[in-house]
Amino acid sequence: MDKSLWIDSIDKMQSFPKLDENKKCDVCIIGAGILGLTCAYYLTRLGINTIILEKDEIGKKATGHSSAKITSQHGLMYSYLKNSFDNKYAKNYLEANQKAIENIKNIIKEEKINCDFEYKTNYVYITQKSEINKIKKEVELTNELGIKSYFITQSNLPFKIEGAIAFPDQAQFNPAKYLNGLIKSIIKTDKSKIYTNTTVTDVKKANMNM
């Protein structure tokens, strides 16, 4: 996992020094992937002094090797959530993921991040006829939950499928470009600091008076 299509597509991912001295902050975030940097972005906007620690260079792990899709469709997740919990739980999951797509879009717009964001339809397909009913039940359920999914039998894939569930209004982007944009937004106020090649080996609990 050394090569990354996304990292290779940009001139340079921003680099940062190693933490080699004691520092104080309001919040310390471990990991500078999309999750960690998104948390840092919102905290910085609130004026909270934040330090982000990354054991490698930014974008070298999960984010740099991601599928680059931004979607609320994760396999046949909603049937699983309904069966394991209930409809309300499944609906909350859907709404949270759909809101996340819009949050990313809003960050891109507000911070003027050029990261090739575009809305797309996302698909989960099957190649076995025995699984068609599972797909159709997922379509029915997700429509009940509030997304206009639909069933298809034809695709542009280079192999035959028996069917697929399509989720409209999903998205894709270049995660490396997005990370660079997030970083610029985080460090421009000097409220937050990022340190790479810094491994966290232990976390100690402390008494906090809030």
Regions picked out by a protein language model, each given a short descriptive name:
Residues 23-52:
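N-terminal Rossmann-like FAD-binding beta1-loop-alpha1 element of flavoenzymes
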Residues 87, 114-124, 153-184:
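Helix-loop-beta segment of a Rossmann-like dinucleotide-binding subdomain
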Residues 1-27, 45:
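Extreme N-terminal leader/targeting segments of oxidoreductases
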